């Protein structure tokens, strides 16, 4: 009887515990605003992959209203593109770019939303199914090798350069993602810093799915690279408790994100981080996506005219060391 009562109260306590994700809500910079020009999302488009023979990648292009082909734009790529561009999702990156570009808090940029690769027989990832069990996502995103960087730099970028006026300056190229898409973004910049130097990571899977927990040690042992990183994670992310109840720190998302942050800090990287109470997903990362973008793209000069009604951040451009 005592055991039954204890079990009942434990279940009742869990049922009444607040959902930590419920604290995170999208703010005005993540929602359409009156008077803010809307960019256009074009696509879907497809490219065959040589890095992963037999697969192809689907992607969409965000073109801001302020885009001028005579002026090279910056570039921001989002892995798991379908999730980041979902108009009812937790990130709504196209709205964020609309608002921040209009406010001149980030530069005019082309956005690319790219999905994991898959074979013709496999389904396209969706907001409900990101493709972990149905596409090439685990191999592409979680592997610490140069194949996915080749997809982005050698397969996707030439097509984007052909169709749009984009700066060749790697300081003006960013890439981001969530979960496995976040570690994939880090891998692209780590392997190809001459092409990408800004990384946005939401609940990054820097864990032992395919050796990702090694990144903290790799960072410490490697020469410093010219990349800027913003990490976000939460204390209620997957915490490394195996099915048998044993704890495995190499599978603890929050622990490994903190380890990576410390390693980057010790090496003198331009790194920022935000730790919250969120579970695994985009809830907190989506809510703070505007701030993450502002910080990553804080290099450009902005207006200091007090009569400028659009500009709202009176900062000077970041000085290069």
Spell out what each predicted region is:
Residues 1-4:
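Positively charged n-region of N-terminal signal peptides that target proteins for export
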Residues 16-321:
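Non-catalytic cap/lid and distal C-terminal segments of serine-dependent acyl enzymes
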Residues 7-16:
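Hydrophobic h-region of N-terminal signal peptides that target proteins for export
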């Amino acid at each position: 009887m005592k055991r039954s009562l204890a079990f009942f109260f434990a279940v009742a306590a869990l049922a009444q515990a607040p959902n930590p994700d419920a604290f995170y809500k999208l703010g005005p910079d993540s929602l359409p605003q009156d008077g803010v020009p809307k960019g256009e999302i074009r696509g879907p488009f497809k490219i065959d992959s040589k890095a992963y023979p037999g697969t192809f990648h689907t992607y969409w292009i965000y073109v801001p209203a302020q885009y001028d082909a005579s002026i090279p734009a910056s570039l921001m790529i989002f892995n798991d593109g379908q999730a980041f561009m979902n108009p009812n999702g937790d990130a709504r990156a196209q709205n964020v770019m609309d608002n921040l570009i209009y406010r001149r808090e980030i530069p005019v940029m082309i956005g690319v939303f790219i999905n994991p690769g898959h074979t013709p027989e496999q389904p396209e990832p969706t907001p409900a199914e990101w493709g972990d069990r149905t596409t090439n996502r685990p191999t592409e995103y979680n592997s610490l090798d140069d194949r996915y960087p080749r997809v982005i730099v050698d397969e996707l970028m030439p097509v984007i350069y052909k169709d749009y006026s984009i700066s060749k300056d790697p300081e003006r190229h960013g890439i981001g993602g969530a979960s496995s898409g976040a570690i994939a973004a880090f891998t692209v910049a780590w392997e190809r810093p001459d092409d990408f130097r800004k990384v946005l990571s939401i609940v990054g899977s820097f864990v032992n799915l395919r050796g990702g927990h090694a990144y903290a040690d790799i960072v410490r042992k490697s020469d410093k690279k010219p990349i800027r990183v913003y990490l976000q994670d939460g204390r209620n992310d997957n915490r490394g408790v195996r099915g048998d109840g044993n704890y495995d720190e190499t599978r603890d998302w929050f622990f490994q994100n903190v380890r990576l942050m410390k390693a980057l800090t010790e090496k003198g990287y331009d790194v920022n981080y935000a730790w919250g109470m969120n579970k695994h997903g985009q809830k907190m990362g989506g809510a703070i996506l505007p701030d993450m973008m502002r910080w990553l793209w804080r290099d450009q000069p902005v207006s200091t005219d007090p009569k400028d009604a659009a500009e709202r951040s009176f900062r000077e451009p970041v000085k290069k060391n």
